[in-house]
Amino acid sequence: MLVNKDTKIYCSFSSNPGNNGCNFFNKKFQSQNINAIYKSFYSNNIKNSVNAVKCLDIKGFAVSMPFKVEILDYVDELSKEVKNIGAANTIINNNNYLKAYNTDWVGAYNYLDTLKISSLTILGNGGFSKAVQYACNLLKINFNIIERNQWNLVPQLEGIIFNCTPIEVNTRGKLIDGRPFTSSGKSIALLQANEQFKIYTNGIS
């Protein structure tokens, strides 16, 4: 589909942007014959990014670490889930009226539901962690939180560990011996992205 004056723009803001969102959403727009494009942007100031959204009439955007909590200061309305979680990752712009949603919890909920577990340990207590905690509460999964200042406890952990901190590639060794099972989190990312697409397109899946 050719970009024209009527093409809607969606984007994401992150301190460490990647290409996954661009690949996913642009393919979805094309497959559904929707006149829209998606672009990932680097940002170190979410307030300025929000101003750009309003100036350029960007229809919707995602935020990732470290903006999932701070973004709440710059929107006009919070969804019920965002009010409960205290963090957002998806924003809709309707004539410069911004409403915040959270789709992270949907991905976490659907993934955790397949595990059929009663307890887990969550690493980190940022925006994504808050969504995982919300999902755990809905599923009645008991959890404890390990924050960065408690990192010395990590090698002693047993059972299910849900890492909600940024992962950097390290080919030299392992922080934790993850046997017998590890999951990269790609399935959670896909689940939440599909939920974002529904919000961006008013229900199209």
Task: For every predicted segment, state its role.
Residues I176-S205:
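Adenosine-phosphate binding glycine-rich loop
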Residues I9, G60, S119, I160-F162, ...:
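Structural motif
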Residues L153-R172:
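Rossmann-like NAD(P)-binding element
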Residues V63-E70, F128, P166-V169, P180-F181:
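Short glycine-rich anion-binding loops that position phosphate/pyrophosphate groups of nucleotides
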Residues A100-G107, L112-N137:
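Glycine-rich adenosine-cofactor-binding loop
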Residues L2-D113:
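Phosphate/diphosphate ligand-binding glycine-rich loop within oxidoreductases
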Residues S49-K54, W151-L157:
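Short amphipathic alpha-helix with an adjacent loop that forms part of the alpha/beta core around
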Residues L123, L138-P155:
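NAD(P)-binding Rossmann-fold cofactor-contacting core
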